Amino acid sequence: NTAKVPNASPTAASAGSDLNGMAAQAAAREIKRRMTAFAAEAHGVAPEAVRFRNGEVSVGDATMSFADLAKKCRQGRVQLSHAGFYKTPEIHWDRAARRGKPFLYYAYGAACAEVAIDSLTGENKVLRVDIRHDAGRSLNPALDIGQIEGGFIQGMGWLTTEELVFDARGRLATHAPSTYKIPVSSDAPKDFRVTLHDEPNRANAIHRSKAVGEPPLMLAISVYSALVDALHSIAPGRQVSLDAPATPERVLRAAEALKSA
């Protein structure tokens, strides 16, 4: 409700965790500072003697739950809300010179895809995919692996099935699920192996993590490349012409061209 709290940035550009995570961390640290100051004053100790660990707070020789301290802070009229703010540092770009640092860091990945094609129909199937993705120090490995799988499947659709077709009057003909084919669960490879390259991000991102939203989409280029390699087996040494998206029709045309060459 933006009438009550600041409006957040959109979840886009693979920057959701980077921006919102760092802003939330900044807010949490300020609230912790207030709670620490309150506890230290109440118990007559230095702020350095206040420790937060595993849901408990140690204040000198005393120990209490985090919930109890929060309750005491509220009763003591300590503000327990804060609006954190974060903007990506160290980025700049000179449009005229085309130089600068447009991104704080880069995410890397590698993928291998195995496909099978039917040279008589153009139908094809992705049999196996192996992915190694650089997620930095992953915030949630299970979620990150799911994001990588989803991004890769989306990329498969981009490169193999999702085709924009316009009629003679320039109107989009593939405008609905009945005409615009997106990947479904049965299109996912039966053997799908994803591992995370667990190495802390050198940039100061939230807990040294890295983006995993959109980067995996590009790894689906491995599927397109595997289709081209499969077509090469029809006529080794000959040039393969295959436009994307590599629909069954286009794979069939490429196969027929190789057979007749």
Label every model-predicted segment:
Residues 1-261:
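Cofactor-binding beta-sheet edge motifs in enzyme active sites
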